[in-house]
């Protein structure tokens, strides 16, 4: 499996080391489109065997004095900043991911052409998000990586907050990861909130149709904010109402924020005063 990043933009490229690997995955899953989800255990195993590599493949004829191979101990931010004109490839041995159950999850036909790939959150460990303690072996969930987002966020992030909610057996576990940056305009804050609300409602609708399907998606806001929302189970009318109330509260907070809504203090007031929207549903 090969993921390509060009100047911070994710381009999905799937390659199998052999035709036998592809046939084996198809045999286990029953669908030839099964491409690209890797469990945390599989990634961990692959890393420990040094079968995961990151490499910068230069697109220019000029040679660089710095090494093009990404070391596991190297800071990815510096690695990216020093190599602007290159492809950054992340390679995972497909054979090393095969033994574990559910090592791959089928994607809809044509999904790869849209430059969208679904991986578990622990893929972030591969690129050393050392301050994100989001990955646990017992709590597996997916993060949707859309074109251009993952390394963009890596390169410019300044603060990460993790919110985890549990509400007994009636509701599933809700994860919200908000990546906050140094300047956020009030209009962007409102726009991001509306954007989150629309996508959250869409996701809960999908969950309701699929009987407790769990998914986690990356929602790109305009300019300087990204939010990860974990939606568990089918949506309910009460959940939609709660999300709408949170949205309205966020807009009120953003509109009433004094000044030009720039700077760290204003950003924190804007985002930490419930200026995030979450969606949660009943588990089956």
From Swiss-Prot:
The chain crosses the membrane at residues 174-194, 217-237, 241-261. It comes from the Eukaryota. It is a multi-pass membrane protein. Keywords: Membrane, Transmembrane, Transmembrane helix. It comes from Saccharomyces cerevisiae (strain ATCC 204508 / S288c) (Baker's yeast). It is found in: Membrane. The keyword Repeat does not apply. The keyword ATP-binding does not apply. Partially overlaps GAT1. GO terms for cellular component: membrane. This is Putative uncharacterized membrane protein YFL021C-A.
